[in-house]
Design a protein with these regions (language model features):
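N-terminal alpha-helical membrane-insertion module
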Residues: 1-76
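Alpha-helix initiation/capping motif
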Residues: 10-17, 59, 105, 116, ...
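Extended aliphatic helical segments
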Residues: 19, 23-27, 40-50, 60, ...
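N-terminal topogenic membrane-targeting module
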Residues: 42-134
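Residues at beta-strand starts and edge strands
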Residues: 87-91, 119-121, 139-141, 217, ...
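An amphipathic, basic-hydrophobic helix/alpha-beta surface used to engage anionic
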Residues: 99-184
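Membrane-proximal, solvent-exposed terminal domains/tails of membrane-associated proteins
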Residues: 146-149, 153-328
Length: 328
């Protein structure tokens, strides 16, 4: 987990590779005695500037790509723009507090990344809260388990030659539900139609939000993974938005536990360009895809995963309202 926040986007491996492919030939041509060498230098500098320049936390090429994707989505079907690698399945359970108190056992839940010989692609906790002024004030919390076929192929083949990935995910979710019931939580496996959608089918995407059919604006945000993460999550839950969705996702990169977080805020008016809270990064031009990825059954891993130590995990908390208790 990073101790600092930065608005400068971090270039990925592909972007760095492209920059090096343009810059290295220019450097090797030094001192650029010929016209051709000077063209190589100019092209290298131009490519580096285009690929590394940014505005409001986004690379310029990312801004262009998202603008073009928005134009395409307005003239065709709306789909999740996130890439999926291979077959995967997700199962979710709804959880409410009872005798156990109001704070989820995050260490226990994260432990289901590797349990019963299966490796989960991600384990996520999602909470939805609505303001008391709404028609259905209250809160809901779900825990989702996502499994990919590739890393679990031997275990799946041992269970059945048909590779029952969805059934395996549901069995793992039931085992987690049983585990939570043993320590006093009320849980139940849920289907997709039992979880409300973040936006309606006819919602219209703009650069700063998605305009829902009711006229409300729903904006998605990445949550910075830094030393202030616990405080940021608390401020999201305490915000005065009409509706909030908050997600905390755990994964395992093979050497350590990682975490990512995101949220969505529904407001009556369009959000401005800046984030409403410190620690939030607006998903400018990518709100629809980000909102689809926030759904408890989406199966899409959140962006921005960073390493999380056991001590940092212990410092996080996730309160859950008891059944029938309003969120705020």
């Amino acid at each position: 987990m990073s101790p600092h926040r930065s608005t400068i986007p971090r270039p990925g491996p592909a972007r760095i590779t492209l920059v090096l492919l343009a810059v290295v030939p220019a450097v090797l041509a030094y001192p650029w005695p010929t016209t051709r060498d000077r063209w190589v230098l100019g092209v290298g500098v131009a490519v580096a500037l285009v690929l590394l320049s940014w505005w409001q936390g986004l690379h310029l090429t990312t801004i262009v790509r998202r603008r073009l994707a928005m134009l395409r989505s307005r003239s065709g079907a709306h789909t999740d723009r996130r890439a999926h690698s291979g077959a995967r399945a997700t199962a979710a359970l709804r959880i409410t507090a009872s005798a156990a108190g109001g704070t989820l056992p995050l260490s226990l839940i994260a432990g289901y990344l590797n349990r019963y010989g299966l490796r989960a692609d991600a384990v996520r906790i999602t909470s939805r809260g609505s303001s008391p002024e709404g028609d259905a004030a209250g809160s809901d919390t779900w825990i989702g388990l996502t499994y990919s076929a590739a890393p679990n192929l031997p275990a799946l083949q041992a269970r059945s030659p048909k590779i029952p990935l969805q059934r395996t995910a549901e069995i793992a979710a039931r085992r987690l539900a049983d585990h939570l019931r043993e320590i006093g939580w009320d849980t139940a496996l849920v289907a997709g139609d039992e979880i409300p959608a973040l936006i309606g089918a006819g919602a219209r995407e703009t650069w700063r939000s998605v305009v829902d059919g009711s006229g409300g604006h729903v904006a998605a945000y990445q949550v910075a993974i830094d030393a202030a993460l616990a405080d940021t999550l608390s401020r999201i839950r305490a915000s005065n938005a009409e509706e909030t969705w908050t997600t905390l996702e755990f994964a395992d990169d093979g050497s350590q536990l990682t975490v990512a977080a995101a949220c969505a805020l529904r407001t009556g008016s369009a959000p401005d360009g800046a984030a409403p809270l410190a620690g939030l990064v607006p998903e400018q031009g990518n709100h629809r895809a980000a909102l689809m990825g926030l759904h408890p059954l989406s199966g899409s891993r959140l962006d921005g995963h960073l390493g999380l130590s056991e001590g940092e995990l212990a410092g996080l908390s996730w309160p859950v309202a008891a059944a029938g208790v309003a969120a705020r």
